[in-house]
Amino acid sequence: MACARPLISVYSEKGESSGKNVTLPAVFKAPIRPDIVNFVHTNLRKNNRQPYAVSELAGHQTSAESWGTGRAVARIPRVRGGGTHRSGQGAFGNMCRGGRMFAPTKTWRRWHRRVNTTQKRYAICSALAASALPALVMSKGHCVEEVPELPLVVEDKVESYKKTKEAVQLLKKLKAWNDIKKVYASQRMRAGKGKMRNRRRIQRRGPCIIYNEDNGIIKAFRNIPGITLLNVSKLNILKLAPGGHVGRFCIWTESAFRKLDELYGTWRKAASLKSNYNLPMHKMMNTDLSRILKSPEIQRALRAPRKKIHRRVLKKNPLKNLRIMLKLNPYAKTMRRNTILRQARNHKLRVKKLEAAAAALAAKSEKIVPEKGAGDKKPAVGKKGKKPVDAKKLKKPAGKKVVTKKPAEKKPTTEEKKSAA
């Protein structure tokens, strides 16, 4: 299948190229805006709604009055009387059985929406441009794999068809009948209450036939399921983009296809059949951004890239980070080394003192002579059977005498002083 070309071939009723070519209208190059199409479709579809409302008397066709407080029941109005289940039941409220609904619907709701004319035309232009792209048409679910060309244009002789069998034969010759078979396969019963409201069966959408003059073409195609017929002068966004999604499969007659430039104009000429209307333009004529940025015109205007790298300095604590301290104060390394040596030297002196004290204590214990014989020698113990103190636990040198505290003298009381006197 061929893609969009500047010249479009016109196909005959036999499904072959007739040899005639038509220039591609400018509307098929318009910007495709799915957001605008969806917005316009949503608002225009609201204009087909029928106003509805509930009765103003619904839920209030009874006499009920609140019982007030003091009865340990809710203060909702209750039906009067007795002798029936209804008496004493709640009424009027939206939470009550048989009561009115919350905010009863009114017929004066704002049902319709106004859409700008230019915006509606923009949506139609986008839908037409999308119908010429095979990828978008296939993404919508249309079976156009065997269709010879998009957009598909046929001769004006088709507009004079009056029999459905002629229309079916044309669709089969154009390889568009697969899309109709898809519609037949999709026919099914509607889910929900629409079955009760004369909307029992649903089906998918098929091709959209766009013609210029009705010489019987409507009668020929209207009985084929899924087919939509549109006059080129009365294009409808609800038909060109069902559901608000672009990509409808369209089949054009030659005269309708040629009329598009007069209806929507080109970028050099305004539309002749519409007053003061210009075709919307692209914001970017070339969407290849990398090609634009690498073009010599833009590269000449750009300055050379800055290759110097500026790194943020991370502030570190020199009291915890030796490398940063040495960077600030190189003498800190010498001070640190001297401190370590001094601590090692002091440790050696402390160990020597403890060893000397232990040796002196051992010599003193050997000089003590026991009263009994040498055989009855007992191990030297401290006072009250305590173990001898280790040399390491001694805090004072052995040369000094241990000062013992004298017991404090008891002072005489005042009574003792009086008796003594």
Swiss-Prot record:
Please verify whether the record's keywords include Acetylation.
Answer: yes
Keyword terms of this UniProt record? Acetylation, Citrullination, Cytoplasm, Isopeptide bond, Methylation, Phosphoprotein, Ribonucleoprotein, Ribosomal protein, Ubl conjugation
Q: Where in the cell is it found?
A: Cytoplasm
Question: The organism sits in which domain of life?
Answer: Eukaryota
| Alphabetical GO biological process terms | brainstem development; cell differentiation; positive regulation of axon extension; positive regulation of axonogenesis; translation
Start-end of Basic and acidic residues biased regions: 365-379, 406-421
Point out residues bearing the modification N6-acetyllysine.
14, 106, 259, 333, 353, 364
Q: Where is this cross-link: Glycyl lysine isopeptide (Lys-Gly) (interchain with G-Cter in SUMO2)?
A: 239, 327
Q: How does it assemble?
A: Component of the large ribosomal subunit. May bind IPO9 with low affinity. Interacts with RBM3.
Give the protein family. Belongs to the universal ribosomal protein uL4 family.
Role, per record = Component of the large ribosomal subunit. The ribosome is a large ribonucleoprotein complex responsible for the synthesis of proteins in the cell.
Q: What protein name does the entry list?
A: Large ribosomal subunit protein uL4
Organism expressing this protein natively: Rattus norvegicus
